[in-house]
Design a protein with these regions (language model features):
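Cysteine-centric redox/oxidoreductase cores and disulfide-bonded domains
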Residues: 137-239
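Extracytoplasmic thiol/disulfide redox context detector
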Residues: 2-141, 224-225
Length: 239
């Protein structure tokens, strides 16, 4: 009897030791799993925070610009010229037409959809020079972002400027027709959309990355004042 009892005790002791060992192993596994999950969650949170902070830094950098530096020769309010020699190069032997417009004007966008491409094509073919002059007639936030980016592209990537210009107006036309002001009445949203349009029309990313949110306030004041004071045949006195 004594031997049987001792054997049972030994078995129970061994079983208890095995249970305790398994419990310790389970605890270690739980600790490892919790630690790994915690590290992963913290890494995800840190990554998201970095992306958000980086995006805010990019926006602030695009907001805090020197318009004179960004716009270069266009800072004085001059138009973008299109002619047979390219963008920014008028042919002095040809007559020069001037088109005044606002990137947030639906009538301007409709006009561009109807005849804009033809006008710039004829200028490129040498029938005339055309001055394409952004002014304020409506003045939504989209006008500011679009004008700023347009003037950057005119300097840094003139070969894509004409396509970009028409695409900017085409986008506004779609938003007006849809009665959707979500983007065009918000400066940051307009800036992001303008960058997308630029990329879609072939503007290099290193140029797109330099687009300011808005460097056009003084430019538009100057160009609008010049337009209002211009002697334009057939125009009334309502401006």
């Amino acid at each position: 009897m004594g031997n049987k009892s001792a054997k049972k005790d030994a078995v129970r002791l061994k079983a208890q030791q095995m249970r305790q060992a398994q419990e310790r192993a389970d605890r270690r596994t739980r600790i490892i799993v919790i630690s790994v999950v915690t590290v992963v969650v913290l890494a995800v949170v840190a990554s998201v925070a970095y992306v958000i902070l980086r995006q805010r830094a990019i926006i602030e950098e695009a907001r805090n610009v020197d318009p004179a530096s960004v716009l270069g020769d266009y800072a004085d309010g001059r138009p973008v010229v299109v002619g047979p020699n390219g963008v920014g190069k008028a042919d002095p032997s040809l007559p020069t037409l001037t088109e005044y417009f606002d990137y947030s004007c639906h009538a301007c966008a409709d006009t561009d959809a109807a005849i804009g491409a033809q006008l710039t094509q004829w200028a490129e073919q040498g029938r005339y020079n055309i001055e394409i002059q952004s002014v304020t007639t409506v003045g939504m936030e989209y006008q500011k972002a679009a004008t700023s980016a347009s003037l950057v592209v005119a300097q840094k990537d003139p070969d894509h400027w004409v396509a970009f210009h028409h695409a900017l107006l085409a986008y506004f036309r779609t938003q007006f027709q849809a009665s959707n002001g979500t983007v065009v009445q918000d400066l940051e949203a307009s800036w992001r959309q303008v960058k997308t349009i630029a990329s879609e029309t072939g503007v290099p990313q290193d140029v797109v990355d330099t687009f300011p949110l808005n460097a056009s306030d003084d430019y538009l004041k100057a160009s609008t004042a010049a337009w209002q004071g211009a002697n334009v045949a057939g125009r009334g006195s309502s401006l």
